[in-house]
């Protein structure tokens, strides 16, 4: 199904290809791997 683009919160959805879920403050967002 869906994947999260760069800058999108990834706590309830996985990141798109070549992105990784990283913690930023109290959120987790997708950033370049």
UniProtKB/Swiss-Prot annotation:
One of its GO terms (cellular component) is extracellular region. Expressed by the venom gland. Disulfide bonds join 3-16, 10-21, 15-30. It comes from the Eukaryota. It is found in: Secreted. Keywords: Disulfide bond, Knottin, Secreted. The presence of a 'disulfide through disulfide knot' structurally defines this protein as a knottin. Non-toxic to mice. Belongs to the neurotoxin 33 family. This is U23-ctenitoxin-Pn1a. It comes from Phoneutria nigriventer. The lineage of its organism: Eukaryota, Metazoa, Ecdysozoa, Arthropoda, Chelicerata.
